[in-house]
From Swiss-Prot:
Protein name: Squalene monooxygenase SE1
Binding site for FAD: 84-85, 104-105, 112, 183, 199, 361, 374
Source organism per UniProt: Panax ginseng
GO process annotations (BP): response to ethylene; response to hydrogen peroxide; response to jasmonic acid; response to metal ion; response to molecule of fungal origin; response to nitric oxide; response to salicylic acid; response to vanadate(3-)
Function summary: Component of the triterpene saponins (e.g. ginsenosides or panaxosides) and phytosterols biosynthetic pathways. Catalyzes the first oxygenation step in sterol biosynthesis and is suggested to be one of the rate-limiting enzymes in this pathway.
Length: 539
């Protein structure tokens, strides 16, 4: 009986083990899947919680923004646009260790007729950013000053470069070649992602910019996120309206030509012809090419397709061109490769927005007559770099926004000097039927021809080597007073006195509206603006 009972127990145990093994075989795979699924849910919940608590960065899942490629934390700064400002900024921030995602509409070499002359002050900023080698290997030409022509007279204004290294000078080049060099240098850094795509909008949540939505070159719609988005998408920016109050003016248009295989009368100098109705510019952009820019007042130029523009260039402009350049100018017109573009000006009027910043032509423009745009942009980038350097974490967008308000005041000495000079010089250099304006134009040419401080002071301002608004103000009214003095000496008749008074009033009418748009306090007394003293936030 004991033997029978033992056998029964053994059989029962054996049956139980067989049943258990069968159950394990049937459900083992399901248990594994259940365990993995639960683990992944727990991990995802933990990550979301950490992200919400530590960075306050993200958007609702219902919007479709979270994908494995753009979970917050993989990028520190998004840069929209990779022109001069965007590519220089990308290299600068990445060189400081930031993870940078650049989204540019077109990464092929651009072909523009402006952004081709970098002033010495801008070249110094290029050195400061470690980008000076980007003017090498593109056939860039050194520029040492300007030659000024008016009514058969000419004078030469040289940059005051005596105190600088021999390499410091202006540079003129093909804009596209220069930009490509900077893009390549930025993209060579491992923490820069350079992508071709069109940014369609900023992603905002609770008043803060969290990133951008964009279309890739294949048409795929994606989103990218970062604690700071910097918009540098140029003069045609479609994003600036939410970040500033854009008051764009178009005082004139440029007509661009290229003269080939000829030298300028004054080697290594830009040439400005004070023509009627407005200035003409010449400068070398390669060893064999001279860029000619003809300013046409107003928002429209004569029609190209019916030959009206070519006729205008031959009959109105060509007779005012220096005789050494006349034949090459006519040949360039006949060749037919005529380009046009509107000249825009827009004072900086930002809406400080947490998580976002505007830079470059998207933020601030001035008439390109003085070639100061790249100098302003590079100077702004140096400031942004210095302001961001002490910060390890950019996620506190409100605090960062308040801190970066200092940028708008700190940039004023350079930006307002170059902006004001560009706007004022353009108005003075244009021909006018008004007798007082004519006297101001003649006085300006003769004042610059005096030499010494009368030429070195203004050219130091224009070059970005001496960005002092008070110096600009004093030289501008010195020109006006010089013009009045010429009218009153030797015989101050009532007619001449009245003309002198009109000259002063006209000069005031030119410069004071520009100063007002730049901001009187920020321009001349930045130290009394509270934002000037903003300290880096302590984390």
């Amino acid at each position: 009986m004991n033997s029978s009972s033992s056998t029964t127990t053994t059989d029962t145990l054996h049956s139980f083990m067989e049943a258990s093994a069968l159950l394990i075989d049937q459900y083992f795979l399901g248990w594994i899947f259940a365990f993995l699924f639960g683990f992944l849910l727990l991990l995802n919940f933990k990550r979301k919680r950490e992200k919400n608590n530590s960075t306050e960065f993200g958007t609702d899942d219902s919007n479709g923004y979270y994908t494995p490629e753009n979970i917050a934390g993989s990028t520190d700064v998004i840069i929209v646009g990779a022109g001069v400002a965007g590519s220089a900024l990308a290299y600068t921030l990445a060189n400081d260790g930031r993870r940078v995602h650049v989204i540019e509409r077109d990464l092929t070499e651009q072909d523009r007729i402006v952004g081709e002359l970098l002033q010495p002050g801008g070249y110094l900023k290029l050195i400061e950013l470690g980008l000076e080698d980007c003017v090498n290997e593109i056939d860039a030409q050194r520029v040492f000053g300007y030659a000024l022509y008016m009514d058969g007279k000419n004078t030469r204004l040289s940059y005051p470069l005596e105190k600088f290294h021999s390499d410091v000078a202006g540079r003129s080049f093909h804009n596209g070649r220069f930009v490509q060099r900077m893009r390549e240098k930025a993209a060579s850094l491992p923490n820069v992602r350079m992508e071709q795509g069109t940014v369609t909008s900023l992603v905002e949540k609770k008043g803060s910019v969290k990133g951008v939505q964009y279309k890739t070159k294949d048409g795929q719609e994606l989103s990218a996120f970062a604690p700071l988005t910097i918009v540098c998408d140029g003069c045609f920016s479609n994003l600036r309206r939410s970040l500033c109050n854009p008051k764009v003016e178009v005082p004139s248009c440029f007509v661009g030509l290229i003269l080939e295989n000829i030298d300028l009368p004054h080697i290594n100098h830009g040439h400005v012809i004070l023509a009627d109705p407005s200035p003409i510019l010449f400068y070398k952009i390669s060893s064999t090419e001279i860029r000619c820019l003809v300013d046409v007042p107003g928002q429209k130029v004569p029609c190209i397709s019916n030959g009206e523009l070519a006729n205008y260039l031959k009959t109105v402009v060509a007779p005012q061109v220096p005789k050494q350049l006349y034949n090459s100018f006519i040949a360039a017109v006949d060749k037919g490769n005529i380009r046009t573009m509107p000249n825009r000006s827009m004072p900086a009027d930002p809406h400080p927005t947490p998580g976002a910043l505007l830079l470059g032509d998207a933020f601030n423009m001035r008439h390109p007559l003085t070639g100061g745009g790249m100098t302003v942009a590079l100077s702004d980038i140096v400031l942004i770099r210095d302001l961001l350097r002490p910060l390890r974490d950019l996620h506190d967008s409100s605090t960062l926004c308040k801190y970066l308000e200092s940028f708008y005041t700190l940039r004023k000495p350079v930006a307002s000097t170059i902006n004001t000079l560009a706007g004022a010089l353009y108005k003075v250099f244009c021909a006018s039927p008004d007798k007082a304006r004519q006297e101001m134009r003649n006085a300006c040419f003769d004042y610059l021809s005096l030499g010494g401080i009368c030429s070195q002071g203004p050219i130091a301002l224009l070059s970005g080597l001496n960005p002092r608004p008070i110096s600009l103000f004093l030289h501008f009214f010195a020109v006006a007073i010089y013009g009045v003095g010429r009218l009153l000496i030797p015989f101050p008749s009532p007619k001449r006195m009245w003309l002198g008074a009109r000259l002063i009033l006209g000069a005031s009418g030119i410069i004071f509206p520009i100063i007002k748009s730049e901001g009187l306090r920020q321009m001349f007394f930045p130290a009394i603006v509270p934002a000037y003293y903003r300290a880096p936030p302590i984390h």
